[in-house]
């Protein structure tokens, strides 16, 4: 007969010691407390997945007979905005988040920012239907308010790796955020 299979589709997995550097990109900026630039065209809602929940889900899939020859999407159950995401990260780092929404065109004209796209920043929503996973193997996730603070603490207290992608340009990033905010406020005052 045919070999049984189960396909599990996952989004970007986040957590401590993330080998892709996506989580560190956010946490390093949260720890310094400065503003973050979000391309104004990339503000869509999303779901990510905590690494501990991903590992648990894979184990549950293997242990369930209901998952044979099926395809599942798994992701965190909460739907996130970048505003909520940065708010949680910056709060866990002891800071208040500030976002500068700058058009892609302006960002990419800045030296060193030609490929600037924060992880999870997308132009279209990335929302998976989790109902089959919830039904077939009781998939559930850790609330984001629980795993983000422990993840930020791990990076603050234990991570000794290199700076995150683009962090060598952090001073320019902060300068652009400040210049954009000041220019935008000047424009608003004229109306």
Where are these regions (language model features)?
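Substrate-positioning beta->alpha
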Residues: 20-26, 39-62, 69-70
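Conserved beta-loop-beta element that borders a ligand/cofactor-binding pocket
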Residues: 1-17
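A short C-terminal helix-loop "cap" of Rossmann-like NAD(P)-dependent dehydrogenase/epimerase domains
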Residues: 27-39, 95-100, 104-105
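Mid/C-terminal beta-alpha module of Rossmann-like enzyme folds, strongest
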Residues: 60-118, 149-150, 161-191
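Conserved loop-to-helix N-cap of the C-terminal "lid" that shapes the substrate pocket in Rossmann-like
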Residues: 7, 42, 47-55, 71, ...
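A structural signal for short, well-ordered beta-strand segments and their strand-loop junctions
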Residues: 6-9, 37-38, 73
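Generic structural signal for alpha-helix termini and adjacent loop/cap motifs
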Residues: 33, 64-65, 157-158
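Conserved C-terminal active-site "lid" loop/helix of NAD(P)H-dependent oxidoreductases
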Residues: 51, 109-140, 159-161, 172-173
């Amino acid at each position: 007969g045919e070999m049984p299979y189960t396909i599990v589709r996952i989004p970007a997995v986040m957590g401590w010691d993330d080998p892709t550097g996506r989580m560190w990109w956010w946490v390093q900026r949260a720890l310094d407390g400065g503003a973050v630039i979000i391309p104004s065209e990339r503000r869509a809602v999303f779901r990510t997945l905590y690494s501990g929940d991903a590992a648990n889900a894979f184990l549950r899939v293997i242990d369930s007979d209901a998952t044979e020859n099926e395809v599942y999407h798994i992701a965190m159950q909460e739907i996130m905005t970048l505003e909520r995401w940065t708010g949680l990260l910056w709060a866990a780092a002891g800071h208040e988040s500030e976002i500068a929404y700058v058009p892609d065109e302006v960002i990419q004209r800045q030296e060193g920012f030609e490929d600037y796209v924060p992880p999870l920043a997308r132009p279209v929503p990335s929302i998976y239907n989790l109902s089959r996973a919830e039904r077939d193997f009781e998939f559930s996730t850790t609330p984001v308010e629980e795993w983000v603070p422990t993840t930020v603490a791990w990076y603050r207290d234990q991570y000794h790796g290199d700076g995150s992608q683009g962090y060598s340009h952090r001073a320019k990033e902060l300068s652009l955020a400040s210049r954009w905010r000041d220019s935008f406020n000047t424009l608003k005052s004229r109306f």
